[in-house]
Swiss-Prot record:
Lineage: Bacteria, Pseudomonadati, Pseudomonadota, Alphaproteobacteria, Hyphomicrobiales
Annotated source species: Nitrobacter hamburgensis (strain DSM 10229 / NCIMB 13809 / X14)
Coiled coil: none
Keywords: Ribonucleoprotein, Ribosomal protein, RNA-binding, rRNA-binding, tRNA-binding
Annotated GO CC locations: cytosolic large ribosomal subunit
Sample GO molecular function, one term: tRNA binding
Name of the molecule in the record: Large ribosomal subunit protein uL16
Function, in words: Binds 23S rRNA and is also seen to make contacts with the A and possibly P site tRNAs.
Length: 137
């Protein structure tokens, strides 16, 4: 699973996701992509599950680019612990995704296979997504 090798701080504020994505909103590498349509936190486990679904459906043909990286730690207190006594220990890593952000890109497969693979990947994510394709030039 993806997580940073080294961070400046161990814990992060909860934060809010405002506005729409300006960077990472267009296809940069592949011919087809999966674009987020809502603001959401996506965990490293969910990204990995989507990646596996993608590559398995494509039968390891073509190429996959993951355009997001989970760099925000989410802390959690243990079960049955009283409130107070500070913030909990880091539990998982997430990425804050704004609407319009491209999550995955693929290339080297047909349009039908790409759409099916990205639909399977989208089912693993807690967010509404849209299939996008590069306009034929």
């Amino acid at each position: 699973m993806m997580q940073p090798k080294k961070t400046k701080f161990r814990k992060a504020h909860k934060g809010r996701i405002h506005g729409t994505a300006s960077s990472g909103a267009t296809l940069a590498f592949g011919q087809f992509g999966l674009k987020a349509m809502a603001p959401e936190r996506i965990s490293a486990r969910q990204i990995e599950a989507a990646r596996r679904a993608l590559t398995r459906h494509m039968k390891r043909a073509g190429r996959v680019w993951i355009r997001v990286f989970p760099d925000v730690p989410v802390s959690k207190k243990p079960a049955e612990v009283r409130m107070g006594s500070g913030k909990g220990a880091p539990e998982l890593w997430v990425v804050r995704v704004k609407p319009g952000r491209v999550l995955f890109e693929i290339d080297g497969v047909g349009a039908q296979t790409a759409k099916e693979a990205l639909t399977l990947a989208a089912a693993k994510l807690p967010i509404k997504t849209r299939f996008v394709a590069r306009i034929a030039e």
